[in-house]
């Protein structure tokens, strides 16, 4: 059967070629009949005859095979070493038209969310991972059929112009009002008011009270709903519980007089803004003071390796700054703080904070860190004990600045005061070292000249 079909195709193609060249007498005007696939090579073939007809036009058709380069498979981007997998949340569906660099899906990892854009203009052919599915680096995500141009927004169809009404003679649809008649009678004279008649109370029927709704009919007062924990929240819970189970956490407290740092900020914030195009805040003072104290107490910058039972001392200072986002708490890292000045620190904090608010933090921005600062004072926290961010050994908690009466030189004065808390791993850091470290931070913030004099 296959050989017969091929024979018919070849014979018909040769006949059509002859028609087009004009060499065949059958193609001049009419066809008495064409016999296909009849010969000694095919004894069982049947005779196929095309009835007499006039050849008006011959049109050729061909099928175009889809080029493999037109359909591409987009894979999961490579993750950092500390991240193994993530959950997929689709922004597009099969059949959607996407432009180049348009976000197709978002992969939520333990630390951040990674957006996967479209590499070219095209149409999504298939989603290879279900919504909420787990993927690793290099896993195929979806297939895209590329198109030439970016998808254009559909223009609203213009409404057809309304046909102009035909001109017709104006006909009054409302008859003219009748002529007003002249009244022949005088209007009635109103009667004088009559005194009110009183009724006995027993004769008054009480008004029926509105029906009271049954308690069971009220809906929504005690409702509850459930939401699945996102991967970042699960990771935060796991790490905090891990720190609680592993570290011997202890917290020491102190208070800082913010008078000098507030005065310095008030005096130089305009010049600082003009020169560096940055606002001078309080966080840079605490970051710089922490780096100064970490150099004086390197054990606070160290960590215990539980696998090898060794203490790892770091010669660099990378400070993580906790930032609250709608998805959860993130801790971007300011690296090599010991080499930075106030302007460098403020610029880095501003850039990382902006990326955190836009959910654009990369995993590399939060990887590592040797010490953490958490500022609960921006939310009004007066006092608190922060939890260590593993694999670190200490965390500093800042709190709200409140005017309080304090004793200064034997007199009571109102000063802007802040409570600070240092939570540390008591397995590695002794109380003396922790208290000394916190007092170094206090001295550097209360009098920044300590940093200049290296006291």
Swiss-Prot record:
PROSITE patterns for the chain: BIOTINYL_LIPOYL, LIPOYL
Transit peptide (first-last residue): 1-68
Cofactor note text: Binds 1 lipoyl cofactor covalently.
Record EC number: 2.3.1.61
Keyword Mitochondrion on entry: yes
Region Disordered, annotated ranges: 153-214
Domain Lipoyl-binding: 71-145
Modified positions (N6-acetyllysine) in chain numbering: 155, 269, 274-275, 279, 309
GO molecular function: dihydrolipoyllysine-residue succinyltransferase activity
Biased composition (Low complexity): 153-173
Protein name as it appears in the record: Dihydrolipoyllysine-residue succinyltransferase component of 2-oxoglutarate dehydrogenase complex, mitochondrial
Origin species: Sus scrofa
Lineage: Eukaryota, Metazoa, Chordata, Craniata, Vertebrata
